[in-house]
């Protein structure tokens, strides 16, 4: 339901939410009238706050208390009232550039460092999903002989992450030179067939193009590649999470039971969390925000999740988000997530 507000109502709603974000205390009309230069009387502020309460944008936690924003109030605030703070974006980009030597590190290490930095800057929990190996394009395949019958299959993905598995050859080759030639032929064949494809495209391999003398290996290779594909198809989304201890510093999480439920979700039920941080396919690069009850999981309904995706080229490969109380400084957090997502996209895409 769209709520039409006058300019004055927007001013007072914005001031009330800003005050509550800063203090974590219910906001009295007197505080708005005296601390914000709105050029209105205390009576006008009081009456306007009452109207905002009747509209469902504010509420009183106790009869004698001031007012606090509802989830609907925060939604209006985020969609219509805030102005993102550009300085935090510049600071984040500068720190990301200074702190990390991207190409010299594995992607998971980079993501962990980025998550830690965002938690430090925001004071909240940072969530980053790792790229799904099943959907990533294969850059290079290498077959390496360990002995006459064991071969290590190494996949290098387009993000430069590596995956590996062992294959036991039924008919090993004792001659080292012949074994090396055989593996080189098989390696060249697989690279020609699979470079630029993903593991979900194994059916595209034309095994008839493999030289006849090496056809004896085709069934074993097919079985191994199917095994790799099945392994990753059953893997849940892997998360990098940082800042869990920061949760305890927020007054909203003073109840032990509430914290335990949220920690259980973050640590043990990540398969349920993954759909919430997946961006809208219609606007994958935009920052998206789930406020309070907009989160479908009960432990997160006292939280806001601000998230976006990072890409390899134009293709989303993972998500990055900041999770905190609904009383978060949105004007700082939104540009922080946007900057981090853009920077991860830049670094992942240039790992060629």
UniProtKB/Swiss-Prot annotation:
HAMAP family: HrcA (MF_00081). SUPFAM superfamilies: GAF domain-like, Winged helix' DNA-binding domain. Keywords: Repressor, Stress response, Transcription, Transcription regulation. This is Heat-inducible transcription repressor HrcA. Belongs to the HrcA family. PANTHER family: HEAT-INDUCIBLE TRANSCRIPTION REPRESSOR HRCA (PTHR34824:SF1). Negative regulator of class I heat shock genes (grpE-dnaK-dnaJ and groELS operons). Prevents heat-shock induction of these operons. One of its GO terms (biological process) is negative regulation of DNA-templated transcription. NCBIfam families: hrcA. Gene3D superfamilies: 3.30.450.40, Heat-inducible transcription repressor hrca homolog, domain 3 (3.30.390.60), Winged helix-like DNA-binding domain superfamily/Winged helix DNA-binding domain (1.10.10.10). The keyword Endoplasmic reticulum does not apply. The lineage of its organism: Bacteria, Bacillati, Cyanobacteriota, Cyanophyceae, Acaryochloridales. GO terms for molecular function: DNA binding.
């Amino acid at each position: 339901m769209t709520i039409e507000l006058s300019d004055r109502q927007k001013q007072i709603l914005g001031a009330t939410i800003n005050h509550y974000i800063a203090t974590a205390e219910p906001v009295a009309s007197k505080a708005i009238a005296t601390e914000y230069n709105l050029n209105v009387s205390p009576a006008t502020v009081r009456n306007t706050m009452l109207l905002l309460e009747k509209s469902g944008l504010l509420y009183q936690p106790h009869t004698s208390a001031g007012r606090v924003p509802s989830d609907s109030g925060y939604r209006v605030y985020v969609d219509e009232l805030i102005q993102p703070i550009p300085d935090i974006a510049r600071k984040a980009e500068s720190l990301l550039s200074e702190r990390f030597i991207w190409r010299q590190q594995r992607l998971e290490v980079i993501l962990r460092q980025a998550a830690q930095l965002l938690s430090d800057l925001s004071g909240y929990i940072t969530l980053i999903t790792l790229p799904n190996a099943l959907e990533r394009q294969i850059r290079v395949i290498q077959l390496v002989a360990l002995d006459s019958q064991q071969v290590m299959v190494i996949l290098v993905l387009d993000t430069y992450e590596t995956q590996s598995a062992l294959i036991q050859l039924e008919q090993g080759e004792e001659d080292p030179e012949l074994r090396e030639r055989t593996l080189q032929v098989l390696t060249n064949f697989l690279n020609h067939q699979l470079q630029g494809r993903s593991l979900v495209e194994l059916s595209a391999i034309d095994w008839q193009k493999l030289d006849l003398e090496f056809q004896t290996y085709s069934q074993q290779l097919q079985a191994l590649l199917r095994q790799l594909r099945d392994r990753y198809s059953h893997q849940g989304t892997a998360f990098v999470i940082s800042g869990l201890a920061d949760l305890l510093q927020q007054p909203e999480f003073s109840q032990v039971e509430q914290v335990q439920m949220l920690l259980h979700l973050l640590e043990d039920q990540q398969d349920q969390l993954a759909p919430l941080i997946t961006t809208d396919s219609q606007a994958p690069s935009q920052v998206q925000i789930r406020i309070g009850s907009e989160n479908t999981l009960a432990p997160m309904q006292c939280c806001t999740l601000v998230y976006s995706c990072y890409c390899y080229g134009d293709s989303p490969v993972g998500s990055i988000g900041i999770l905190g109380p609904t009383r978060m400084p949105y004007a700082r957090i939104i540009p922080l997530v946007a900057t981090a997502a853009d920077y991860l996209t830049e670094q992942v895409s240039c790992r060629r």
